[in-house]
A protein has these predicted regions:
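Nucleotide and nucleotide-moiety/phosphate-recognizing core
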Residues: 1-110, 120-134, 141-147, 154, ...
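Hydrophobic alpha-helical segments within soluble ligand-binding/sensing domains
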Residues: 114-118
Length: 192
């Protein structure tokens, strides 16, 4: 293992149990899947989050669930990345995306927040948008006048929850490809 090859994978969400199963917690759900598959306990408390570390296919990996609430996610991610000296391009963010249908993935090497307050916070705290992200489709509001907060904080219907669960293996494969320097391949295989 290359000792400089360390990655931070952060799943975004809100920490209270009342938010379990909500659209905004798609990142938490995906991170829980990775932690289970990779045998990494995400139970240490520091950096305003729950975190754990392990090794995945020769890469040192730190998994993080910020406990700052979505809009302040950067307040957890930036200090942890700084502590472990993880550069921004080795920070993979898992988050919800209301512009994609439930279960669809949008993989990007960098870019704007696209209206996502969690990503805005991370961009501000890391000092730029040069970090990869796996955006997980949770579906658009049912009508334009529907309150966005009510939508993203609403529970997934069973079929949408299944669509997310069905894509978790693809999220895992995408994270591994990104860590292997093959983000373009991940995009061609798993976007959509």
């Amino acid at each position: 293992m290359n000792t400089n090859d360390i990655w931070l994978i952060a799943g975004l969400g809100n920490p209270e149990t009342k938010y379990d199963g909500t659209r905004h917690n798609a990142g938490y759900a995906a991170l829980d899947y990775l932690a289970d598959k990779w045998g990494i306990s995400v139970s240490k408390t520091k950096f305003e989050g729950l975190w754990g570390q392990g090794e995945v296919d020769g890469h040192k990996v730190v998994l993080l669930k910020p406990l700052t609430y979505m809009n302040l996610s950067g307040d957890s991610i930036a200090p942890l990345a700084g502590f472990f000296k993880i550069p921004a391009d080795h920070v993979i963010v898992l988050c919800d995306d209301i512009t994609q249908n439930p279960g669809k993935l949008r993989i990007r090497p960098s870019g704007s927040a696209g209206g996502h307050n969690g990503l805005k916070s991370i961009i501000a705290r890391l000092g730029g948008d040069g970090f990869p992200r796996i955006r997980i489709g949770v579906g658009a509001k049912p009508r334009p006048d529907y309150d966005l907060a009510d939508w993203v904080l609403g529970k997934f219907p069973a079929e949408d929850a299944k669509a997310l669960a069905d894509r978790c293996p693809d999220i895992e494969a995408t994270a591994k490809l990104i860590m292997d320097g093959k983000l373009g391949l991940a995009q061609s295989k798993y976007n959509g």
